[in-house]
Amino acid sequence: MKVKNSLRSLKQRHRDCRVVRRKGRVYVINKTQRRFKARQG
């Protein structure tokens, strides 16, 4: 999982990427290509 300051470029890496909020943190998840996970921090 990548940790980045800004998720703007990471959410455009794949068309299935979704931005979700969990426990006060912002994540990019991808159900089809799981290698595109990222967290803002």
From Swiss-Prot:
<dbReference type="InterPro" id="IPR047621">
    <property type="entry name" value="Ribosomal_L36_bact"/>
</dbReference>
<dbReference type="GO" id="GO:0005840">
    <property type="term" value="C:ribosome"/>
</dbReference>
<protein>
    <recommendedName>
        <fullName>Large ribosomal subunit protein bL36</fullName>
    </recommendedName>
</protein>
<dbReference type="InterPro" id="IPR000473">
    <property type="entry name" value="Ribosomal_bL36"/>
</dbReference>
<keyword id="KW-0687">Ribonucleoprotein</keyword>
<dbReference type="InterPro" id="IPR035977">
    <property type="entry name" value="Ribosomal_bL36_sp"/>
</dbReference>
<dbReference type="Pfam" id="PF00444">
    <property type="entry name" value="Ribosomal_L36"/>
</dbReference>
<dbReference type="GO" id="GO:0003735">
    <property type="term" value="F:structural constituent of ribosome"/>
</dbReference>
<comment type="similarity">
    <text>Belongs to the bacterial ribosomal protein bL36 family.</text>
</comment>
<dbReference type="GO" id="GO:1990904">
    <property type="term" value="C:ribonucleoprotein complex"/>
</dbReference>
<keyword id="KW-0689">Ribosomal protein</keyword>
<dbReference type="GO" id="GO:0006412">
    <property type="term" value="P:translation"/>
</dbReference>
